[in-house]
Amino acid sequence: MTARVFKTAMILAAGRGERMRPLSSVLPKPALPMPDGPVVASALRLATSAGATRIVVNVSHLAEHMAEAVAEVSLAGVEIVLSFEDELMGTAGGLALARDRGLLGWEDSVLVINGDGALGLDLEGFADHHLARDELVTLALLPHLDPERWSRVVLDAEERVEEIHPPGRPDPLEVPFLYPGVMAVRRDALEGLPAAPGEIPVSLWGPARAKRKLGGRVVAGHWREVGTPADYLEVVLLRLAGRAWIDASAEVSSGASIRNSFVGCRAMISDRAVIEESVVAEGVCVGEGARVTRSVLLGAVEVSAHEDIVGEIRATPP
């Protein structure tokens, strides 16, 4: 028997990125650059690996930059459609708007993925599990990484969502799971979403849970939050694994030293400058003999000659 797949996926990428400021004043959070493509690339690749041949991405904040980031990711045989939001609709409202525009098709369940995480999940069997059960929504779940940092999902014996707790120490007998921002949504649940701004926990999960039709499925893989500048830097450093990565459009003096850092597009690094465990991208200019350590510099930022920057976040729109 051939495993079933999700033909259509939607990636949520329209938020303002308030916690990512000041970086999100230059680029939307899902468009932030990383060595293997923008943050949203992992969501796009996951949707493709799950069988999607049509991916809808909603965009609003700095929409043109988000569109450029999506276009960077090469996905053979996949149609990518942008759903522009003049008014920010929220996570549930964005789904409803894409539905009303006919972008999500008219049949089958839809795979919905948050666009602001760095994730690599094994969704083999996830569609089969979702479609075989009488669930309006099925959450992909991971064993919890840090219950005191992120919300906890608790399942009952039938793999229905019993509780969703805020971050905190679990009860001794509780088995907490982490929601990494991936779910399957049945067509009738999509049709029930109000055509108005709203958020998924209230507008989608709430009604499904009230009917005991909000399920969870534990999957294998990894997830890292990219919610704040500190998160972003840590995820980039993990991807680098001790190496330096320099974009082809960057200009780096032969006398500069790049150590375990990401030098992104249009950056200019002068002679004898040292960049260590940092991100420098989107047109940053680093002067002669300057040092940048454990920092993120984005946009029209200019580092003076011999300036020493440690643990800073600087971002200036071009």
Region roles according to the model:
Residues A244, S249-A256, S261-F262, A267-A273, ...:
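A structural motif detector for beta-strand N-caps
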Residues T8, T53-I55, E79, L136-V137, ...:
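Residues at the starts of beta-strands that form the adenosine-phosphate
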Residues M66-A157:
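Conserved beta-loop-beta/alpha segment of the NTase-like Rossmann-fold superfamily
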Residues S109-L111, A118, E124-L131, L142-P147, ...:
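Catalytic-core segments of class I nucleotidyltransferases/pyrophosphorylases
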Residues V56-S60, A140-L141, V296:
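Short internal beta-strands
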Residues M1-A67:
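N-terminal glycine-rich phosphate-binding loop and ensuing alpha1 helix
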